[in-house]
Amino acid sequence: MDLRTGEVITAPQAMNGVYTWEINNPLYFTITRHQQRPFLLNQDIITVQVRFNHNLRKELGIHKCFLNFQIWTTLQPQTGLFLRVFRYQVIKYLDNIGVISINNVIRAADHVLFNVIANTIECKLTHEIKFNVY
């Protein structure tokens, strides 16, 4: 849902994309939180935020786009190592597709979490997306 207007994001808006070779460093990756074994669980909870670059947002007609992935895993990875592997694999997947869009970034993260990185239990996606109104 668009946070600015409250309208549902349409399929053409979500599939609108840019070729990967047209934009340098299209995505920013940060780990905003890493909870190690909270509440005596045998899982770590890692929150990764993926931000779209200014040039990518300009091409897609987006004012703001943050994708927040809350990941439950039984691994006990170092925070920097997990981020490096996650970032590299997502960019690799997008380079193989050749197009960066909102849907493709979500698909890439899903592929990395459940097919590449072992022991992922669950992933919850929240987003902050605002399209340009004008």
Curated annotation (Swiss-Prot):
Transmembrane segments: none annotated. It comes from the Viruses. The keyword Cell cycle does not apply. Pfam families: Gemini_AL3. Disulfide bonds: none annotated. Keywords: Host-virus interaction. GO terms for biological process: viral process. The keyword Chloroplast does not apply. InterPro entries: Gemini_AL3 (IPR000657). Increases viral DNA accumulation. Enhances infectivity and symptom expression. Homooligomer. Interacts with the replication-associated protein (REP). Interacts with host proliferating cell nuclear antigen (PCNA). Interacts with host retinoblastoma-related protein 1 (RBR1), and may thereby deregulate the host cell cycle. Oligomerization and interaction with PCNA are necessary for optimal replication enhancement. Belongs to the geminiviridae replication enhancer protein family. This is Replication enhancer protein. It comes from African cassava mosaic virus (isolate West Kenyan 844).
